Each structure stands twice: as structure tokens, then as C-alpha cells.
């Protein structure tokens, strides 16, 4: 349980989990990873895995979380998924699944020990430093249009901050914007 976290701080858990997983994978595979907002783990332009989190709430407090982590470890083919890859395809090395699991669990423990309402600023900075396409002109699609813009960062609530080439700055919740790459 995360008794120190309220619904206002829910994105803190996402930051901690995605950062822990990427840290563990970097140590194992010795390759660079990035985070495609809000929860995909990439190496280059290829998706290696992702994180899903369901928070259990009591009142305004996060009483617990169900965290799902999916990592493509030793897969060799991804039919119909042009952006998918695996640790094996990136490194050429077959990995022991237990070794990957233990490294992730250890990293999660370290990040969870840091979790509090006050930990978001530091975690957010770390998360933004790994944010895929941050600071680069990219093509996006929302419910209305395709447009060019630049990812500027994330808000404390986990919204993606995009500055359109027109200068307009918009904040998007999960599911409301897609990056075309």
C-alpha cells in the first residue's frame, strides 16, 4: 500500500514503476531505454515492454495498486507488430527470465522505498529525462487533427505537455493523443 499517496499523486506510482523497470533492463541488457508516455518502454523506436497500473482507492487515498509489467525478453518474431522488439533482438543474448524478474523486483523495491507525496518532483525529472521524443518536433494525432509539435514534459498529474508549432501549449490525458513515428 501507498498510504502517503492520494489520487493527486497517482502518477508518482507510474513514474516509479516505469523508471524501476527501465533501470533494471539497462543494467541487464546494457542498452539505452526511453519511456513513451505514459507507460511504454522503448529501445530506439522499438517497444520492448510496458506497464499497466490499476489503483485501489479508499476515500482520497491510494490503498493499493495492481501492477502489470510486460517485457519482451527472448522473443524472436513479432508478426504484424512493426515497432515491437525484444531484449534478445536488441542484444543477441538469450536472458534468464528469473534473472530479469529478480533485477526488476529489486529496482521496484528501491523506487517504492522512495515513494511519498514529496517524491514526485525528483521522479518526474528522472521520468522526463527518459521521455521519448521530448524536445523533438513530432507528428501527433488527437480527436480533432494531426499536427506537429514538441513534447515539453508532463504535469504533476501525468498529463502530456505538447507545444504545437503554432505556439499553443496543450495538456493531454492518457488515450487522448497519439504520437506518429
Segments (PLM) and residue ranges:
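Long, positively charged amphipathic alpha-helical accessory segments at protein N-termini or as interdomain linkers
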Residues: 6-8, 12-32, 43-181
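General beta-strand structural signal in soluble alpha/beta enzymes
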Residues: 33-37
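Interfacial segments of multi-pass membrane proteins
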Residues: 1-4
Amino acid at each position: 500500500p501507498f498510504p502517503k499517496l492520494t489520487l493527486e499523486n497517482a502518477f508518482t506510482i507510474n513514474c516509479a514503476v516505469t523508471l524501476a523497470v527501465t533501470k533494471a533492463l539497462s543494467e541487464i541488457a546494457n542498452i539505452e531505454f526511453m519511456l513513451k508516455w505514459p507507460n511504454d518502454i522503448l529501445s530506439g523506436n522499438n517497444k520492448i515492454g510496458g506497464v499497466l497500473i490499476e489503483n485501489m482507492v479508499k476515500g482520497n487515498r491510494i490503498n493499493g495498486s495492481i501492477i502489470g509489467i510486460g517485457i519482451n525478453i527472448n522473443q524472436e518474431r513479432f508478426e504484424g507488430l512493426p515497432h515491437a522488439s525484444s531484449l534478445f533482438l536488441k542484444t543477441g543474448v538469450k536472458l534468464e527470465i528469473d534473472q530479469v524478474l529478480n533485477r526488476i523486483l529489486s529496482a521496484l523495491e528501491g523506487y517504492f522505498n522512495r515513494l511519498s507525496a514529496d517524491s514526485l518532483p525528483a521522479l518526474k525529472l528522472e521520468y522526463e529525462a527518459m521521455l521519448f521524443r521530448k524536445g523533438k518536433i513530432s507528428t501527433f494525432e488527437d480527436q480533432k487533427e494531426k499536427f506537429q509539435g514538441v513534447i515539453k514534459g508532463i504535469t504533476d498529474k501525468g498529463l502530456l505537455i505538447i507545444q504545437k508549432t503554432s505556439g499553443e501549449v496543450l495538456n493531454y490525458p492518457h488515450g487522448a493523443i497519439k504520437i506518429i513515428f
